[in-house]
Amino acid sequence: MTDTLSPWHLYMLRLPNGMLYTGITTDVERRLAQHQAGKGAKALRGKGELVLAFHCLAGDRSKALRLEYRVKQLSKTQKERLVNHPPLTLDHLLPDAEIKTG
């Protein structure tokens, strides 16, 4: 299911109530479909339509996990800024790793 050779992605989903959910995966489309089918994170079940708000390459699994942690520590305002004005890289979140957005 999670090929260690596949690149990992960080993604953010917008819930109908405006909340942003952050996760990592090797296949964004597959993971979004799982969430929408109610087979993903329990926190998203029954929350309504989920919209992919942001995604970026995150490198290997280790970097993706660290990036996910850092993004989850951001305030709602900082997350909205990331979604609405994606930077070219997320290097400022993980100074030791180059993370490309887009």
Curated annotation (Swiss-Prot):
CDD domains: GIY-YIG_UPF0213. SUPFAM superfamilies: GIY-YIG endonuclease. Pfam families: GIY-YIG. Residues 6-81 form the GIY-YIG domain. PROSITE patterns: GIY_YIG. Belongs to the UPF0213 family. This is UPF0213 protein in potE 3'region. It comes from Serratia liquefaciens.
